[in-house]
Amino acid sequence: MALQSTILHMARKNLLQESCRQLLIQTHGLHKSVASGSLEIAAHSQADLKEESAVSPAEEVQKAARVKSLKEMPGPSTVANLLEFFYRDGFSRIHEIQMEHAKKYGKIFKSRFGPQFVVSIADRDMVAQVLRSESATPQRGNMESWKEYRDLRGRSTGLISAEGDEWLKMRSVLRQLIMRPRDVAVFSSDVNDVVADLVKRVKTLRSQQDDSQTVLNINDLFFKYAMEGVATILYETRLGCLENEIPKMSQEYITALHLMFSSFKTTMYAGAIPKWLRPIIPKPWEEFCSSWDGLFKFSQIHVDKRLSEIKKQMEKSEEIKGGLLTHMLVTREMNLEEIYANMTEMLLAGVDTTSFTLSWSTYLLARHPTIQQQIFEEVDRVLGGRVPTGEDVPYLPLIRGLVKETLRLFPVLPGNGRVTHDDLIVGGYLIPKGTQLALCHYSTSMDEENFPRPEEFRPDRWIRKDASDRVDNFGSIPFGYGIRSCIGRRIAELEMHLALTQLLQNFHIEVSPQTTEVHAKTHGLLCPGASINLRFTDRK
């Protein structure tokens, strides 16, 4: 009875919302007709609306009465799930398990991992429904370990780990600085300086090999490029990651970051084990805390350094100029602990995500020389030999398509989490408020219904044929959607677009004979399962 009552209440609520939506659309249609001097537009809009949404209250209630409970939702048993992850190395195959479960149980299914109950959604339209129904402060999936560490150390949460009004305040500060392409384009000069060092580093590394062309383990190089590029924007300083000798402080950060991702599996183990067992199995939690200690220490040193410089400038009555960090320190829209936390989390989020995408992009270009040549010809036609800027990127649709297609095939986050803010009916099931959802982005991006021939690498699938053509959809949303989408998206795209463009200007990229076919594995993020070794031959 409780379930039926809830469903009927939601049916009435949905019907009321639909009625309001119809009224708004009709009003909009009438407004258009008055503005254009033609009543045909309004009449056509209303006719279409009547045809599309002529659902009676009785039909709406009858439809809602067919809604099922979570008990009726299919999914693997708890024992089967634990066996999959603990004994069959499921942690490194999360992206594959998504597709296996979607094929076996359907595009919405439930699972339990230790104390965590999750509803997984592997359907584009259902994902869209969930994201479009979010509140003003969407809640991510389970990040209790992040919050627990911050409570333990007395640290603030940052944009990734914060929730509610605290998160909304931080986002409102940061979004005005780095969310729009034109805002990020001002960093083109700084990023291009880093790209120039990347090109030099490619030449140095290949000269160390017998064939004078091969760069081994390309992801290590792109990791250092991404770290240098993100830090240049966030901290307004160079770290020396692309030098022959990396400074000690930067190397310590790299070590801490590697530890963070290497401890992903053990941290997941810890999430499935009650806290009272930590004294018996202490290593996962100790490594997790140790890596965060290193990351926060690194950020605090650089933030404090810039703060000291600003204070000296103010004492001398000098004009204070700078970028993102300077703005945050001068305006004081966040306190110092919040700045430490946000700098730490944004750097963490911006390094491996960018480096993995660049690794996959260059690997795909090397394996598809015809496509590589097409993209190079576009770059050469638009730029000639000059260095690109952020303003050039809109005129390089194949470069943009290259990044989008790479992220479709290898989404850095194979899945994303949400906690429902209200009761939802999704896929014919009533999902109660407070339920943890897993949005299966890898599965939707490889779905034939969303992308014909999904296994093929086709950057041109993202090019619009005309102004009315929309090729983007919820099947591939690597940066998320809506108000809780990735805050650093524009920075990451700028780094990738400028780097890929200039690598193609300088080199023809081939797969080294030392590299066999590389498959993806999940290691917190979706990363190459083996070293990618590439040959870089000068174009000139």
UniProtKB/Swiss-Prot annotation:
One of its GO terms (biological process) is lipid metabolic process. Transmembrane segments: none annotated. Its cofactor is heme. Induction: In the retinal pigment epithelium, up-regulated by L-thyroxine (at protein level). It is found in: Membrane. It catalyses: all-trans-retinol + 2 reduced [adrenodoxin] + O2 + 2 H(+) = all-trans-3,4-didehydroretinol + 2 oxidized [adrenodoxin] + 2 H2O. GO terms for molecular function: all-trans retinal 3,4-desaturase activity; all-trans retinoic acid 3,4-desaturase activity; all-trans retinol 3,4-desaturase activity; all-trans-retinol binding; heme binding; iron ion binding; monooxygenase activity; retinoic acid binding. Following L-thyroxine, expressed in the retinal pigment epithelium (at protein level). It comes from the Eukaryota. Its main location: membrane. It holds the Pfam family p450. Its EC number is 1.14.19.53. Efficiently catalyzes the conversion of all-trans retinol (also called vitamin A1, the precursor of 11-cis retinal) to 3,4-didehydroretinol (also called vitamin A2, the precursor of 11-cis 3,4-didehydroretinal). Also acts on all-trans retinal and all-trans retinoic acid. The replacement of 11-cis retinal chromophore in photopigments with 11-cis 3,4-didehydroretinal enhances sensitivity to long-wavelength light. This may improve vision in fresh water which is often turbid. This is Cytochrome P450 27C1.
